[in-house]
Amino acid sequence: MTNAPERIINATAPIRVCDLGGWTDTWFAGRGTVLNIGVYPYAETQIFVRSARGRTREIIINAENFGQRYAVPMPIEYEKHPLLEACLDIMEVPDDVDLEVNLYSHAPPGGSTGTSAAISVALLGALDLLTPGRLTPHEIAALAQRVETEKLGLQCGIQ
């Protein structure tokens, strides 16, 4: 990907603190109520969009917190960062664009602040700008939860 981007998309999502009632909102709990507080620092996504006309689409992920940069195999496989790859897979991104996806959060992974969920929301929100129509913030959050439960088969509540 050497040509200049046609478009640059930036998206952010807050991490969360104070997970009161966590895990009461899962399918196996029946019903529950969770109180989260979204705070700074945000999870950040920046996507450089370039034309891929006339050749196979290329998607590059730069997971800055992990110091990893790699090309996503086509068709998309869940290999290096399944959460990120599943987000790319669930969105119907046009085939005629190359994507260079940069992801970063000041909050470290595994810190119990919902960083992974925030990264998913920011990435899905950015990818939504490449697809027809627009999802609401609530729909983006629900889609992020579907990525974890349906695409990856994980147990998770709604953050």
Show the residue positions of the predicted features:
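Alpha/beta catalytic cores of group-transfer enzymes, especially the acyltransferase/condensing modules
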Residues: 135-159
